[in-house]
C-alpha cells in the first residue's frame, strides 16, 4: 500500500480500495472512526494492531490543522485552519437562541466574486478546497463543541464555483454509515451563479439554497457584486424558479443591508417585484463592519421600515441578528486571520 490522500475525503468503498483491505467491512470501520472525529489510526480499537500500524505508515486521516481558535461572548466560535500547502481558511460555529449549532464552512481559499461589501471578496482567489478540506472543517468544529445540527456553505468562497467538491463533501457527511447528517439540514449559499443553481437543482439533492441577492436594482447590484451581476436579474430569477420547481423547496434571498445604499422604499419595492412569482423567503442581514470597507451598518429604523414594507407585500421575511462580530466571524467578515 502506497501513501494516499487524506482519508477524510473518501467514501467507505474508496477507503477499502486504497487501503487494500482483505475484509470488505474494514473500509466501513475506518470511515466510521473518521466520521466520529478520530485523528489517530492507533485509536481505532476494532482494527488489529498490525493493520493500525500499516495505516499509520501509509495513510493520513487529515492534512489540515487548527492554528487559532476565537470565541465570542455570544457563543460564536471561529477556527483558523491551515491547509497542507500552508494556505489558510476559516470555519465558524453559530449558536442560535434555542442552542442549535450550525457549522459555517468555507469552500475556497479567498473568493473570486469580489463583492464590495465582503472581507473575503477583498482577498482575491487562490484555489478551490478539496472535499477532504471541507469535511475536515466540520470535523474540527465537532471536536470543539460536540454534535452539530446544521451546515451552511456561507464561509469563504463561492460554492457554485467548486460544486463538485462541495457535493462530494455533502455525500461524505450525509453517508448513513458515517456522520449521517441529513441533507435537509444543509444549505448552499451562492452570490447568484445561475449555471451552478441549475446544476445543483439537477443533482436532486435534498439541500436548501440561499441566494445573496443584496439588491434587485441592476446598476447597484453591478456595483456591489460585479462578478455575480454578469448574470442578469432576469436570468437569476429564472434559475431560482427552476430550483423551486425541480426541488420543491423554498429558496432564501439574502439581503446584506447597508446604510443609505440599498435600504430605501424603492429598493424594497424592487425586491418585492423580484420575489413575485417565486417561492422565496427573505433574510435581512444588517451589514457587519469590516475595517477596510467603507460602508455603514443601517440604523434600526431603516431595517424595521424595510422589513415592514416586505411584510405589507406578504413577502415572508426574517431579520438575522448579528453574531460573531467580536471575532470577525459574522457574515461578510471571514478572512481577517486567513489571508490568501
From Swiss-Prot:
InterPro entries, alphabetized: Aldolase_TIM (IPR013785), Methyltransferase_A (IPR040072), RlmN_N (IPR048641), RNA_MTrfase_RlmN (IPR027492), rRNA_lsu_MTrfase_RlmN/Cfr (IPR004383), rSAM (IPR007197)
Cofactor: [4Fe-4S] cluster
One of the Pfam families matching this protein, by short name: RlmN_N
Intracellular or extracellular location(s): Cytoplasm
Gene3D superfamilies: 1.10.150.530, Aldolase class I
Keyword ATP-binding: no
Catalyzed reactions per annotation: adenosine(2503) in 23S rRNA + 2 reduced [2Fe-2S]-[ferredoxin] + 2 S-adenosyl-L-methionine = 2-methyladenosine(2503) in 23S rRNA + 5'-deoxyadenosine + L-methionine + 2 oxidized [2Fe-2S]-[ferredoxin] + S-adenosyl-L-homocysteine; adenosine(37) in tRNA + 2 reduced [2Fe-2S]-[ferredoxin] + 2 S-adenosyl-L-methionine = 2-methyladenosine(37) in tRNA + 5'-deoxyadenosine + L-methionine + 2 oxidized [2Fe-2S]-[ferredoxin] + S-adenosyl-L-homocysteine
A GO BP entry: tRNA methylation
Domain of life: Bacteria
UniProt keyword terms in alphabetical order: 4Fe-4S, Cytoplasm, Disulfide bond, Iron, Iron-sulfur, Metal-binding, Methyltransferase, rRNA processing, S-adenosyl-L-methionine, Transferase, tRNA processing
EC number: 2.1.1.192
Note on cofactor: Binds 1 [4Fe-4S] cluster. The cluster is coordinated with 3 cysteines and an exchangeable S-adenosyl-L-methionine.
Sequence similarity: Belongs to the radical SAM superfamily. RlmN family.
Protein name: Probable dual-specificity RNA methyltransferase RlmN
Organism field: Treponema pallidum (strain Nichols)
Amino acid at each position: 500500500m502506497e501513501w494516499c490522500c487524506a482519508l477524510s475525503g473518501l467514501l467507505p468503498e474508496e477507503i477499502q480500495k486504497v487501503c487494500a483491505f482483505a475484509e470488505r467491512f474494514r473500509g466501513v470501520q475506518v470511515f466510521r472512526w473518521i466520521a466520529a472525529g478520530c485523528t489517530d489510526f492507533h485509536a481505532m480499537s476494532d482494527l488489529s494492531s498490525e493493520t493500525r500500524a500499516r495505516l499509520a505508515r501509509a495513510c493520513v486521516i487529515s492534512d489540515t490543522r487548527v492554528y487559532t481558535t476565537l470565541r465570542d461572548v455570544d457563543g460564536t466560535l471561529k477556527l483558523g485552519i491551515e491547509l497542507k500547502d500552508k494556505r489558510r481558511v476559516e470555519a465558524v460555529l453559530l449558536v442560535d437562541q434555542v442552542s442549535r449549532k450550525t457549522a459555517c464552512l468555507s469552500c475556497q481559499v479567498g473568493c473570486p466574486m469580489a463583492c464590495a461589501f465582503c472581507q473575503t471578496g477583498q482577498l482575491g482567489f487562490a484555489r478551490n478546497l478539496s472535499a477532504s478540506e471541507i469535511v475536515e472543517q466540520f470535523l474540527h468544529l465537532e471536536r470543539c463543541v460536540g454534535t452539530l445540527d446544521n451546515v451552511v456553505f456561507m464561509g469563504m468562497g463561492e460554492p457554485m464555483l467548486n460544486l463538485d467538491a462541495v457535493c462530494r463533501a455533502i455525500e461524505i457527511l450525509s453517508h448513513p454509515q458515517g456522520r449521517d447528517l441529513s441533507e435537509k439540514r444543509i444549505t448552499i449559499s451562492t452570490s447568484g451563479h445561475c449555471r451552478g443553481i441549475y446544476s445543483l437543482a439537477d443533482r436532486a439533492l435534498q439541500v436548501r439554497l440561499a441566494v445573496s441577492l443584496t439588491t434587485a436594482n441592476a446598476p447597484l447590484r453591478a456595483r456591489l457584486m460585479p462578478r455575480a451581476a454578469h448574470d442578469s436579474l432576469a436570468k437569476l430569477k429564472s434559475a431560482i424558479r427552476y430550483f423551486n420547481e425541480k426541488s420543491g423547496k423554498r429558496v432564501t434571498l439574502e439581503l446584506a443591508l447597508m446604510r443609505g445604499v440599498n435600504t430605501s422604499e424603492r429598493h424594497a419595492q424592487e425586491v418585492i417585484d423580484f420575489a413575485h412569482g417565486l417561492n422565496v423567503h427573505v433574510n435581512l442581514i444588517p451589514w457587519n463592519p469590516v475595517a477596510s470597507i467603507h460602508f455603514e451598518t443601517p440604523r434600526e429604523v431603516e431595517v424595521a421600515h424595510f422589513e415592514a414594507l416586505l411584510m405589507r407585500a406578504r413577502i415572508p421575511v426574517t431579520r438575522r441578528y448579528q453574531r460573531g462580530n467580536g471575532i470577525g466571524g459574522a457574515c461578510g467578515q471571514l478572512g481577517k486571520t486567513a489571508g490568501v
